[in-house]
Amino acid sequence: MVETTLKIKNKSGLHLRPAAEFVKKANEFQANITLERGGKVVNGKSIIHVQALGVRQGMTINLRAVGVDAEDAVAALSELVNNKFGEE
Amino acid sequence: MVGVVIVSHSLKAAEGIKEIAQQMGRDVPVAAVGGTADGQIGTDPLAIKEAIEGVMGSDGVLLLVDLGSAVLNTQLAVEMLEDEGQDQVVLSNAPILEGAVVAVVESAMGHNLEQVKKAAEEAIHMEKLL
């Protein structure tokens, strides 16, 4: 398992569009990907789950990936989050 | 990419849902259709048929409807399509707004019609408050 903690820096948090960007990127990988916030764990490949997590600016989330390309998945998704999804 | 048609009793509602859903993937063909031929609240099978044809590509079209007669008139619209078109069009049981959002994300990822339909229908069980 590959795991990292990410701080959400973009203004609007994981609202619809960033959540969609996250899910699209997550689906490029074979690995099983989950997000956790405050003890709630959701499937990182499902838009329904990711947007329901209610992640706002300043919150931290745990990103976990299990599978052959887990390391690449965590790296790519971390980059997306840390680059604020191309937003402010 | 799978196309998406949003059928509501109100054109404004359909267009609003389209606006939200397209935030999730700009390239996905989405059509909004609603209201009767004389602009009242309701649905019009001919307008729905034209909306389907407008987004029809080789990957097919998922149809999302609001309530009651929208279902019946959408089924009628599908029957009005050419035979080969009918096989590529699927009516979804998904909630119209949540389903549209999911469908556009799934379509943008290149998933097929069956996968897009299945994911959109999972929105029925969506918990808004985790």
Regions found by a protein language model. Give the residues of each.
Chain A
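Intrinsic-disorder/low-complexity, polar/charged segments enriched in Ser/Thr/Lys/Arg/Asp/Glu/Gln
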Residues: M1-T5, T60-N62
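Intrinsic disorder
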Residues: E3, K7-K9, A73
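Compact, glycine-rich, soluble single-domain proteins
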Residues: K7-I48, A52-Q57, E87
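C-terminal structural segments of small proteins and small subunits
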Residues: A52-E88
